[in-house]
């Protein structure tokens, strides 16, 4: 005799309907770790997590290395899946071929799609998402939605009409509302680069551009802040703070420090020292010197300069011999009590 569950399942017009306990949409999300532990923490709350299916928005002012972070994630996805491709929607045209190669990305595995307006992006991306199967390995990068006009705005310019465009936010909201179910059902990560603007007021804060629709649809939203990394008077790169504005895994308003240098891109072990100092896993015995702290005896390891703390040899023993991974998880992931304040970590980064 057919059970009521079997009857409902057989009668469903949705071919992916499944008993919840067996549904592939409610299994643990497949995460792709990047090479940078603190980027994984910012994405998932764990050094072992990473890029997951769904929409990740990287927002910030111009020249905040937003595309760098997007390509770091996309490169990790290609490295993990040998048959994966990047669907790259480009409205900025600011990424030369050498930029992709810097992140170890084979440009023959990228479908480059230039876009001029929101509607063009919407029609193409929905057609692509319709055609992709759940087993296809695809990661989508949009660079950027911040600079994308609506079709109406372009038509008004061509017809020499100087009226305000009220359709852009609505078009973007519709675009992401349509994309979101596909990303989950077809297991696709999508990374969208966006701009921010400052709200008006005595204490202005950064607002993600493009209206509220992006907020509702996104799984992760980062707002990137930065300061110069100087050696004497020479700028070597930038110290970034990833401000987690929204996340399914990470506590909102978390602050995660990351360093990016001119010559080496995103520094693999950056941000870890700031957390280790705040949590007592490392210390600063004297100005300009750092040392790991033995958690059972309190003894200090060898004193090293800052550059040596960006090396694998400094971190391997800390990860292997202490509960530093758990400290990071408790500090950043939802459902755990933070052990130190976020501001304390960022103060260490500033110091």
Kindly label every feature range from the protein language model.
Residues 95, 148-149, 199-200:
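Catalytic P-loop NTPase motifs of RecA-like helicase/translocase cores
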Residues 115-187:
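Phosphate-binding/switch loop-helix module in NTP-utilizing enzymes
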